[in-house]
């Protein structure tokens, strides 16, 4: 049985697209539920019109300016929460949106869409600005899983749609049957 431990802050404090691709196959642990990350999107800096920090630093976007390895949770359409992980060097606003996961515990369930995964896991605005490194209840770990993924344009946005910054697993059949993970 593998013991799941949080990834180090250095994992998140890198180029956002590198972090987004390397999060594919990593394990998200949240309050007793374990899921494999299957889809991510990058939002990078003030030159990315789809990034919340494109217009500068605000109370809402302050967390995006670092340090890396913290959660950025916000509400969209007045009803859906979205989970992001802050990336890059402190002072540079960037984050990876977690768009999809495959839950492996307590049940086997594929969740496509950031709102669906937050609803199922119970993630809400109270989980904004959580340290993912020094936290036993909410973190990302690595069980050595490498999954094939494709790169596409980001979806669900109206600006910055030309960026190929969405990463999605190409085959989820029999995804996790050989892994036994214990947080």
Curated annotation (Swiss-Prot):
It is an enzyme of class 3 (hydrolase). The keyword DNA repair applies. InterPro entries: Formyl_transferase-like_C_sf, MPG, MPG_sf. Pfam families: Pur_DNA_glyco. GO terms for molecular function: alkylbase DNA N-glycosylase activity; DNA binding. Keywords: DNA damage, DNA repair, Hydrolase. Its EC number is 3.2.2.-. It comes from the Bacteria. The keyword DNA damage applies. One of its GO terms (biological process) is base-excision repair. Belongs to the DNA glycosylase MPG family. HAMAP family: 3MGH. PANTHER family: DNA-3-METHYLADENINE GLYCOSYLASE. This is Putative 3-methyladenine DNA glycosylase.
């Amino acid at each position: 049985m593998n013991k799941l431990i949080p990834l180090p802050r250095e994992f998140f404090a890198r180029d956002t697209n590198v972090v987004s691709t390397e999060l594919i196959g990593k394990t998200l642990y949240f309050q007793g539920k374990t899921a494999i990350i299957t889809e991510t999107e990058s939002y990078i800096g003030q030159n990315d019109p789809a990034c919340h920090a494109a217009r500068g630093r605000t109370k809402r976007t302050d967390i995006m300016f670092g340090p890396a390895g913290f959660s950025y949770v916000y509400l969209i359409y007045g009803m859906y929460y979205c989970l992001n992980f802050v990336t890059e060097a402190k002072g540079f606003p960037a984050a990876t949106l977690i768009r999809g996961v495959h839950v492996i515990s307590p049940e086997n369930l594929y969740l496509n869409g950031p709102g669906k995964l937050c609803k199922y896991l119970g993630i809400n605005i109270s989980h904004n600005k959580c340290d993912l490194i020094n936290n036993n209840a909410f973190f990302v770990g690595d069980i050595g899983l490498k999954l094939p993924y494709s790169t596409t344009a980001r979806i669900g946005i109206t600006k910055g749609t030309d960026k190929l910054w969405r990463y999605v697993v190409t085959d989820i059949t029999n995804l996790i049957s050989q892994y036994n993970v214990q947080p």
